[in-house]
């Protein structure tokens, strides 16, 4: 076990991770050495055997860093947050079977709410989206309604899902409104970990920004979860994509024909669509050219989804594809290649 040893004796670091007499920070440093120098198969086995120790080390250090961020909030503390989130990601990736059974369900959910808080910087919120999708990919049908509501609120600009409690937004899911008639005991309010800094670059279109992130992460993270049964990777993607279609596609493509199918296409000529109405929204500061936009909502989101789908259809194969005269330099669809 642990055949790679470019950084000292990894076995000694393994022992120090499990040594309860050592402080949490020391154990964290040695846990990072183990993660960075162990073979992937050995690392999976190590996490499976010592999951309780590993989560304790992670959580204790996360709490310390969170307190430090709220007191100081300097660049060094933000770098420490990045480092501890690296450990959090490894926990999500290497322990999907336990997470699927709701291991540390409330603790992980609380941490993700702190990352997804709308008062955080965009970088932290986007990282929260990425880690939340990893968690949901592992939970699959064992998630609760709250996680599905949160998934439906990850991309700002869409209508809030309705429930028996009224509209659900990311803000009231992270910090539910108080009902003092039920109980006088209330949970502590969740506050931002890293508010936006003065030099942070903003985004004019948050809907497009988070939509692109979500579509990217539900694909590229599929194989990052180390399931013992590899079929769960595809199930995880199917779970996320089915809920994307449920919560977002009806708004992005409100007039989509549900009768259409790749296998049984409708070949009738469709009715002419009305001409879109464009309005000038602003002028370019450098060229003074007018910038127009259609009044139709989610038009940018529609373009993003179409481009995302096309990226899987038009995949460049520079060396393996056949030579077709007149198509030099063109990217061919897979069915032509």
From Swiss-Prot:
State where the protein is found. Answer: Cytoplasm; Nucleus
One GO molecular function term of this record is:
GTPase activator activity
Q: Which UniProt keywords apply?
A: Cytoplasm, GTPase activation, Nucleus
Write out the GO biological process terms.
Answer: activation of GTPase activity
Gene Ontology, cellular component aspect: cytoplasm; nucleus
- Give the matching InterPro entries: Tuberin/Ral-act_asu
User: Its function?
Assistant: Catalytic subunit of the heterodimeric RalGAP1 complex which acts as a GTPase activator for the Ras-like small GTPases RALA and RALB.
> Subunit structure, per the record?
Component of the heterodimeric RalGAP1 complex with RALGAPB. Heterodimerization is required for activity. Interacts with the HLH region of TCF3/isoform E12.
Name of the protein this chain belongs to: Ral GTPase-activating protein subunit alpha-1
Taxonomic path: Eukaryota, Metazoa, Chordata, Craniata, Vertebrata
């Amino acid at each position: 076990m642990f055949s790679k040893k470019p950084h000292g004796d990894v076995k000694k670091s393994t022992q120090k991770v499990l040594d309860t007499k050592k402080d949490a920070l020391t154990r964290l440093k040695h846990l990072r050495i183990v993660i960075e120098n162990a073979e992937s198969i050995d690392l999976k086995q190590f996490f499976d055997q010592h999951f309780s120790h590993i989560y304790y080390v992670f959580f204790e250090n996360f709490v310390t860093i969170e307190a430090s961020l709220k007191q100081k909030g300097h660049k060094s503390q933000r770098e420490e947050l990045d480092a501890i989130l690296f450990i959090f990601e490894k926990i999500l990736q290497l322990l999907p079977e336990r997470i699927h059974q709701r291991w540390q369900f409330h603790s992980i959910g609380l941490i993700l709410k702190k990352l997804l808080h709308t008062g955080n910087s965009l970088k932290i919120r986007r990282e929260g989206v990425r880690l939340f999708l990893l968690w949901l990919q592992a939970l699959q049908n064992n998630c609760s309604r709250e996680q599905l509501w949160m998934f439906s609120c990850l991309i700002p600009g869409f209508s809030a899902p309705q429930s028996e409690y009224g509209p659900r937004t990311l803000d009231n899911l992270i910090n539910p409104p108080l009902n003092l008639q039920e109980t006088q005991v209330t949970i502590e309010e969740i506050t931002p970990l890293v508010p936006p800094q003065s030099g942070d670059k903003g985004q004019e279109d948050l809907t497009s920004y988070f939509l692109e992130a979500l579509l990217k992460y539900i694909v590229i993270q599929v194989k990052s979860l180390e399931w013992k049964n590899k079929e769960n990777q595809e199930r995880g993607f199917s779970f996320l994509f089915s809920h994307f279609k449920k919560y977002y596609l009806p708004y992005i493509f409100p007039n989509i024909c549900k009768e259409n199918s790749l296998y049984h296409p409708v070949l009738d000529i469709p009715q002419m669509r009305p001409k879109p109405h464009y309005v000038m929204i602003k002028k370019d500061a450098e060229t003074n050219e007018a910038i127009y936009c259609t009044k139709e909502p989610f038009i940018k989101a529609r373009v993003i989804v179409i481009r995302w789908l096309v990226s899987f259809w038009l995949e460049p194969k520079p060396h393996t594809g056949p030579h077709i005269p007149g198509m030099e330099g063109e990217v061919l669809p897979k069915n032509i290649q």
